[in-house]
Amino acid sequence: MSHQHTLPVTVPAVVQGPLKTVCSPDHIQQEQAKQPTPHPTQCQVFTEIQEKGFPKHEEKRPNPVKDLPDQKCEHQQQPGPQKQQLQVKKSQQELQEQELHLEKQQLPQEPQGLLCLEQQQQQEPQMQEQHLRQQQQQQQQQQQQQQQQQQQETQEQGLCLGQKQQQQQQDMLVPQELHLRQHQEKLQDPELHLGQQQKTPEEQKLIPGEKQQELHLGQRHQEPQEQELHLGQKQKQKLHEPELQLGKQQHQKPSEPELPLGKQQQESPEPELPLGKQQQQESPEPELQLGKQQQSHEPDMAGDQKEKQKLHKPELYLRKQQYQESPDPELSLGKQQHQECQEPELQLEEKQHQKPPEPELHLGKQQESHEPDMAEDLEEKQKLGEPELHLGKQQQQQIEREGYQGPKSLGQSLKQEKASREQQLDYSHLEQEKELSDQPLDQALVKKGKQLERKKHELENRTQQEK
């Protein structure tokens, strides 16, 4: 390109020189055809064209054309001027063709550069959008994964908590069930024990070791009976002393004074019975009052009282059976002896027996009217006094028989007296053992009564203070 523009400038100096130079573009074209120049980028070509500019070439072109007519005028004398002009024209035409060719090449390159720029500008936001979309998709995927992990963790935690709660509930239920079973077994134990006690009263009657069982049962009785027992012992001793004296007198004296002595013996137990009844009347009254106070002031003790009553019921039942069964043989003996005795003796004895029970009946009526709950205790204690009367009757009958038989039957009477005394001693021993066995329960009840009285006093003091 640069050679093509500079060659026409050297033409005015020598005519032949420019001719040679004019011919040179053919060689240049051939060389360019052989060695194709590397096409610059579209953007570079566009900038070079702007920098160089086409009007400069156009300005330089007319200069050789203007100079050529002058040269022709000056060198008309030289041979072959026409040929030279033709060559110049040809060279000019070639130059114009080359310029046109270059312009044609440059014109399509300019829009290509613009297209590249436009494409790049269009592609950049698309690439950015794609990149943003990819980032958003990645973020969404990460969030979904995190949510799934959180859900799994929460589910695992919920399962763990549910398992722990179930284990805790099972751990709590197992000891509770064991405790309930133990409590039920404990409740069943006394029931079984009571059932065994109720089943074995008949067996205990046949077994000679009644004393041990009675002691075991008697450990739950009440203290107020101690005084009654002491009084009963004293009364028994008093009864035995006149009986012994009577026996001695009977051996020494005839049978005539035996009747008034028998009457005295029958009359002697009369004051004993009212004393026992008075004690019975006096002793249970505070117990009943204490029970009422416990129900009024201490409702919590109701369950304990019920349990104790349940425990005492079989014992009372056993004792009733024992007392009811013990006097049966004595009664049968007494009936036989009374039938054998003479009629006047029976009349006297009936009169004597009819007189003392009258105040006893009045007392019994009063007790039933004022204290209906204590009827069972009174019956039991009256039964205790009955064997003593039967023994007195037996002694009187024996003495009367001996008096009628005379001195021949003294040996038999002595034997009978010894046997009766032994029976009385055995009976007294049994009663003493029963009384001793009843003492510990009596003490416990007395203590409870004292505690209740203290609580009453405290409550009364509080009520007074509040008033």
From Swiss-Prot:
Signal peptide: none annotated. Keratinocytes of epidermis and other stratified squamous epithelia. Residues 76-95, 105-177, 278-290 have a biased composition (Low complexity). It comes from the Eukaryota. It is found in: Cytoplasm. Its main location: cytoplasm. Part of the insoluble cornified cell envelope (CE) of stratified squamous epithelia. Belongs to the involucrin family. This is Involucrin. It comes from Mus musculus (Mouse).
